[in-house]
């Protein structure tokens, strides 16, 4: 089972992976919750159903005009038993389905079927204009496909607008709040050094223009603050080393304000001390972060969205992991667990 596209729009080589899996008789299940709009035009990559995945889950409500909680499960081959799927749907599905939600799904599907060509053509036109307008940003950076190598992404879904902050004193959460409180623009999520805006076929030119204008205004403000910071750094160097400066001063400054990959750092794997089920069967205790270093986690801790665990029960709580938690807290990211993490409390296996 793989996720494609990811929250940020990274798409895997579904066709290639499916071929390898099928050689070994293994079905490929694709969590394509954020890819319901793929394959209908607009120059977007093809969807996983047409690329040979055996089961594909798509959330209509994430990228198409449909109510929250509406999704589709596509069964695409005989490698997955339809009877088995029906069995588990009977166990987990509600016995009181919402006819409003189901009717909304039908309207969504009919809209795409009857008006999809026009809607997706306009969608592509507006996205292209937006990305072109944002090419001149200096302290902010709107990600494009050129930022990703083939090793990082087979393809990319640019309906996800990923906006990076290049100023080390600002975070993705800061940008998220700035756009919300000052410009009344609601983004989807924030991470360490970027924020994510979701778009759909229903977005109009006005929305893209408002976001572009807001980003340019914020960018100008950051450039002004950055110039003052740069001058201060240069003055401090002159005081310390005299008036001679070398050509690397600009690069030194840029390195100071540009953080490395926050995601790679915060999701660094933790050493496993025991299986999850073993940790959950043992006694637990709630302790401070400082007391927890060197102990074993008894909790799932994750950033939401997207909800990928930073640590799970049975993994070692290292001093480095505690520092990563403190970094998330300092950036005001949505850190979740069963304890009050913002009060620096964490649940450990007690033995």
Task: State where each predicted segment sits.
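Conserved C-terminal alpha-helix-loop-beta "cap" of PLP-dependent enzymes
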Residues: 135-231, 237, 246, 253-316, ...
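Terminal helix/beta-alpha structural elements that buttress the NAD(P)+-binding lobe
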Residues: 338-351
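Conserved PLP-enzyme active-site core in the AAT-like
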Residues: 1-143
